[in-house]
């Protein structure tokens, strides 16, 4: 497969930031790393090996972006407003700088595991016009986990379990007709993410948004051993057209 490394200057972040691409045809997938991890996380943990047949067949191509979670979501001793403001600058970098550079006008699928699964969902729900869908594995969708007892509008805007119940019919309609896949195990370290995923399922059902929520077994833990299998399964379904929605 064609693999390319990129480093560019972000106006929003006022720093250089990196990303890597895998493949060059098929449906584009924007991959967010898990908590505090980097753009090379999926490659280091065997995800590219699992997805290589689909990438080499031109069914999907991946753009793996970088994150700054360690300075924002994970910096629990920091000031709430400073942390979420920096996160929003990174969010704007993805929307205003990275996506225009890599999408070539295509609506991408947002994806990730754990914190990356949260980011994938958050980007999709805030900007559905940029995405054809989301594949979120073991995501946590409530900002209160990282910002306990928050009282901040910007944090609210980054907390899908809080803002989605207030979605207007027009907003909910923007989510329809897309590929929405959310998966979580029921094994070790999946209790909190499983509960969060279940709440998200209920909200989307009440909004009348068609989606696929798949809870795997009690032996399925919060790690790449299972995320590799889940990614292979769900992206395989997308490649086959078994779960495909027009953007």
Task: Name what the model sees in each region.
Residues 1-247:
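Non-catalytic cap/lid and distal C-terminal segments of serine-dependent acyl enzymes
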